[in-house]
Amino acid sequence: METAVVQILKLTGNGIPQGWLTLEEAVLHYAAGEVIWELGAEVATLHGGYNAVSGKRSQITVNSIVGVAGFGKVNPFDVVPLLTNDKLFRRDKFHCAYCGDHAHASDLEREHIVPISRGGRDKWLNVVSSCRPCNQRKGNRLPHEINMPLLYAPYVPSLWEDMILRNRRILADQMEFLSAKLPRGSRLTA
């Protein structure tokens, strides 16, 4: 496995997602004794130096999912993920909310349902993915003013959905773990 692209799913001790770690960051948690449990496959074994007394070489084996010491005090259902175009387009499966066409990320734009100039906010519930022609056609109007109904409703991703949206190279065991926690009806399961 190519260790340069492997990301380790970091969870609190009680299983709440905290983020994605590089292999090097994960090794630091292991070396500090902060990993209290692990799941998933072993993704890498790193070798260190030799013990001067025993002559044994140190090694750390890293699993794809680690629980680190500490228990999150945040209710995961209150967390609102950071809005980025990459996550927005992935949430909407690279489909325009107005015409339904599938497009590459470079051909999509963040479209504000209620335009900023008309009091709309740059929030998950007010943005959808739009192809350039639809975004230009809609312009500074509301969808009903130009007879452009939304084909799907925007939503705020859950913490578990956000973890999926944040990583393009999720290992099968990590995806299985995250998918088991997705809200019923999540678009990320289809």
What does each model-identified segment do?
Residues 1-80, 85, 154-190:
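Short helix-coil boundary/hinge micro-motifs
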